[in-house]
Structure formats: structure tokens, C-alpha cells
Amino acid sequence: MFLAAIHVITFFISENSKSFYTMSTPTSAFNAMLDDIGIEIQDDISALCSTLADPSDAEPAPPVHDVDDLLASVGPDKRKKIRSGLLTIHPPSSHPSWLKPETWFPQCDDILEIWCAKFEKGEDTGNLHVHIYFKLKHSNTIRFELLQKWITKHVTGFDFKPQRSATKNSTQCVVNYVLKPETSVGDPFIWNASCAFDQKTWDARHKGKGKKQEIIDHIMARDWTLSWASLVHESDESRALLADCGWGKRFQEDRAAAQPRRKIKDVVILYGAAGTGKTTMAMDWDSKPDETTKARYYRRSCDEDFWGGGATAYNGQRVIHYDEFGGQEKFASLKEITSIGLPGPPVKVKGSGRDLNHDTVVFTSNVHPAGWYKGVWAKDPHQFKPFQRRVTKVLFFPRERPDGTENVPSDGNPAHFVDQTPEWVAFGDNLDLAIEHAESCWPLPATIEDDGGGAFAPGFSLTSEPEPKRRRFF
């Protein structure tokens, strides 16, 4: 139907041009009426003619295998103009009127081209719902906010997905999705014989994958620890497939969140001289042949509160490594991160948050662990015990090997270390025993200032000036 307003005269011309009507009304009032019912009006006869035949309908289209490939999301723009799409509604009953267009759409005879509807029950929930596919005539569109107004007059909630492209092939695929007999509850409703289930098109969906399934398969074949940026730019194939995929980033992030929650079982300290192989051992800790280093291992930087971001973000790795550690992590946080038998705490990742999902913490340090939190332990020596009992293994890397040669690992000559776990366990809650142990095997600066300097815990700095009134740790 072609409608145009010229000043105060409105012309109504039928599509076959056999009827002609005139009426007089103020232009502003007429425009307000059109805006209220949400019908988009063509400005001239050439625009009308261009929409009476959809050129894409005449072009062959490949079979569509997933109805989600044909549908989009409305997005935040509630004034978005809609011509066709899939409605899902949860009506209060199974009365046939819920399937009919006049229940939902005013003036349906004037604006509808296709309408089909059917009751279904959810496979998982068993809840009754209605699937409706509608397509408006070429000269008509409605805004989403108006559709929402019409639907919510009768029900409180609904889901709507607009059709990406209203070609014949895509339209038939969505019609088939609504009318498929295997999920029907009762008979479907088809308005004015405007469409029908097509078995040939329905069968063709099994001959290949839809794009969404292709994307899912591509993502699932990659490591779940990969960041979205790394996954997209992995190859030309990935870039072509994933560059414009809006939901893929969240899908990949949810893979990490879906991993089973681990419980912390090991807290390991590797301390001693520099260059003796501590960091190399930490990076290889508990490695497995079928597991990549990136999937297993994460090095924690204490220079910031965040646990990385983007490609450097923590992403569910099971081994967390603190390198060059001297107490930089807040003591309260460290206790949570090393709580044996419990899952890791939530942490901040740039742009989001994440639960730590590790089972092992490895510390490498040039400092004896008795000095890591000297400020905390000087104020309250009883705070040493919660830390001491969390540690399950302590390995000391001396500067020299037993034969007097330098302790530098090489091919065929692995790092030399001494297992001091029994001594560590024997400390119990006695901080003084730990201090004496440090004095005997790995001397450290004579005193520790409470000035917050250096890269260590607040209060840890190196000095040669004695202060006998302060507690001696080493």
C-alpha cells in the first residue's frame, strides 16, 4: 500500500492502482498517527516499486544449517526498524488465540505478509512457549519499541531476534524452525496460507555446518587459556572467521570459568643464590607432556594489583610463580592464595575479575623466607605460624656444590639443592628458630629497617648500620 501526505491532503492508492481515495487532515496529525502505529512510509512511487520485489530473493542461496546464523540481536537501539524475525513468548495458557496475529498486531491484515506460530515445550524445563515467525509487507517496518509495547500488553516478557536478511531461503529456514513437527504441541497456526513447512530445505540443514557451529568448533579446538586477541590473530583463518564475531570473546572467557575448581595442594619455596636454576625449576614445576606451559604456568607480577590484562591476564593456570619474591604481596592476600585444601580467591584482572584456579604456588627468592614479612612478624610473631604451616616444600640452592665448584646448572649437570622441608616443618610457630636457621645457612643483611624501602615487603631494606634496639632477624 502506498501512502503519502501532501499538505492537508492524503492519498491512499492500492497496490493494483484500482482504488483511489482522498481525505483532508492536518499534516502534523497525520504524521503523529503514522508514528504511533509505527509504519514506515515510502516517500515516492519509485521507492515503493523498488521494494515490491526483493532482488535477493531471486538469487540462489546456500543451505542454512543453524537458525541462529539467520537471526541477530536487537541491541540497545529500541527504535531499530524491524521487518521480520522470530518471537518467543511464554503465554499464561495454551489457548489457540495466542497463536493468532490479531492478538498481538493491530491492523495485521494490512501489514503482514507471513505469519506462522506454534506451541512448544522446552526440552529441559518442560515450560510451554510459543514460537512465532512474522514478515511484514515490503512497504512496512515497525520499531522494536512499538513491537515491545504490543507484546507486553498481554505478557510480561518475550524474546525477539530480527532476521538478518529476508531472502526466500532464509525465510523458509526460519519458517521450518517454527513449524518443525518433532517439537509441536498441538497444531501450528499459519495465517492466510502465507507459508508452509518445506521438508527439502529442512533436510538440507544436515549437509554441513552453520557459521556459528564453525566458529564454536574453531574455538574449541584451541587452548582455553588463550586470550581472545591471541586466538583471533593466531592465523589468517582465525582472523577471517573471528574478527567480527561479537559473542566469541565471552564464549572463550567462559571456557576458563567452566573449568573445574581446583584446590590448593602445594606451596613450594626455592631460595638461595642467584643463577642456580631456581627460576628454571619453577617454570617446569609439575609439567606434563600433554600440557603447554601457557596452560599450566603463570608468573605473578607484584608491581600492580591487577593479575595482568589482555594477553597477559591470569587465565586459570594451575601453577602460580612468584619470582624474586621478598614479601611484595600483601600478607592477607598471600594467606588466601596459599590456603591448602581450599580453592583460590577472586582477583582483579584488567577490565574484569577472575577466580584463581591453581593447585600450586612456587616462590623463588634470593632471600631466606624468615625475612619476607619481617614487619608483620615483628609486630605479631604469632602471624608466622599461618604462613609456616601453608608451606609444603622448601629447597635451598647454595652458591657452591659439595665439591666446591660453582652451583651453575648446565646440560648433564643439573642444579644442586638441599631439601630443607624437615627443618621448616620443625620451626612450627617459633619465629626465632627460623631466624636462627637463616643465620646458619644463608646470612642476610644484619638489620632490617622499618622504612618501607626497596622491593620487599613494607619495612624491608638492606643496610649495614646496626640498630641494636631493633629485633635482629639474621
Curated annotation (Swiss-Prot):
One Pfam family recorded for the sequence: RNA_helicase
Chief place of localization: host cell
Highest taxon, organism lineage: Viruses
Keywords: Host nucleus
GO terms of molecular function: RNA binding; RNA helicase activity
Motif Nuclear localization signal: positions: 248-255
GO annotations of cellular component type: host cell nucleus
Region Disordered, residue ranges: 455-474
Organism the protein comes from: Avon-Heathcote Estuary associated kieseladnavirus (AHEaBV)
Known function: Plays an essential for the replication of viral DNA. Presumably cleaves viral genomic dsRNA replicative form to initiate rolling circle replication.
Protein name as it appears in the record: Replication-associated protein
Tagged with keyword DNA-binding: no
Coiled-coil segments on the chain, per record: none
Location relative to the cell: Host nucleus
